[in-house]
Amino acid sequence: MRTASITRNTSETAIAVELNLDGTGAYSVATGIGFLDHMLEQLSRHSLIDLTVKIDGDLHIDQHHTTEDSGIAIGEALAKALGDKKGITRYGHAYAPMDETLTRVALDISGRPWTVWKVDLKGPRLGEWDTELIEHWFQSFAQAAGITLHVENLYGTNQHHIVESCYKGLARALRTAVEIDPRKADSIPSTKGML
């Protein structure tokens, strides 16, 4: 099975993540930030990646460390579960509509982390979550996972819808990219022979 467990303890956060790439989208998420929980639940449900996340963070200071470290730990778990990446589809993309909003996400499980973020969030918060941290979550996740990630909100007005479409787009793109291609189940999807 393609699974991973990550424990990450710093002076700022204590995190435990469990991940199953071949799951059904089952989740148990408790970060201490309600809107982040909601987004990680969407990520799990729509990627079909089972995800358990438990964080005890320094929220009495602010939400930065919890947000950043959750992205890092989930990214590390994804990379660990992928192992040598034999047989994966590697690339994934999705258009995620939500009411008046449409977002495009494309990714490559390349081993070359990069994030392009073209999302304009106008307000300072969603629920209690600082919106400036949302881009940082995606960057932290992509860096730790070793993926090239492009997220572009094409249009939309409701911030909740915009952010949720970003996470759902990521989920659907991951669902495709981590799938095993039975025609190449024993080979690395690269002419270099490694990712």
UniProtKB/Swiss-Prot annotation:
Main location: cytoplasm
EC number: 4.2.1.19
Domain of life from the UniProt record: Bacteria
GO molecular function: imidazoleglycerol-phosphate dehydratase activity
Reaction catalysis annotation: D-erythro-1-(imidazol-4-yl)glycerol 3-phosphate = 3-(imidazol-4-yl)-2-oxopropyl phosphate + H2O
Keywords: Amino-acid biosynthesis, Cytoplasm, Histidine biosynthesis, Lyase
GO biological process: L-histidine biosynthetic process
UniProt-listed InterPro entries: IGPD_sf, ImidazoleglycerolP_deHydtase, ImidazoleglycerP_deHydtase_CS, Ribosomal_Su5_D2-typ_SF
Protein name: Imidazoleglycerol-phosphate dehydratase
Annotated gene: hisB
